[in-house]
Amino acid sequence: MEILSVFDAEFKKYGRVLEGLDVTELLSELEKTEKPDGVVYKPSEPEFEKLTVFDVIKNNVYGGMPIQIGYCNGTNTKLNCVEYHRDSEINIVLQDTVFLLGLQSDLDNYTLKTETIKAFKAPAGSSVELFATALHYAPCDAKKGDGFRVAVVLPRSTNTDKPEIKPICEEDKLLFAKNKWLIAHKDTSEAENGAFVGLIGENIDIKDLI
């Protein structure tokens, strides 16, 4: 596996780098948040949502839809799972960060061969949109031991409690939280906690590439 850049042409299938957003204040607030040895995710951080950029992203990027800005911080080098939402996700990175990405079009009966996963590095301070069709999960370190802090923008209430549903189609078995469809590798805590197991092949680890 090669680690590509979000500025490479290959990334256009997965997302785009957003230009024109002033995220200076957001990055300052993000720097104050925790960065554990594992991975922590908080869907909504009130301090982020008081900032001017909150309304700019809500109106300019999401066209006025209700949004939340939270964070995903920690240290990680593995794929473990992929997820998708019904909309784009914006990731604003404090430091160089790697994303392991797949495509919904590569799914076969909601299974995915991990050999189809690509790695892309986003530079510090960049704002990266991942399209709704991009399969993704926790960010990865770009340099061994450095960890990451990433502000995560999604429609309001995404990744909160799973709705109670009566299954009507195969995709329903993937629903893991609100607006979150999850596909796990068998060797993960998510699989142990009932996530649909559909990643086929090696659980990718980039520790020897960084």
Regions of interest found by a model, annotated:
Residues 1-124, 137-210:
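Active-site region of the double-stranded beta-helix
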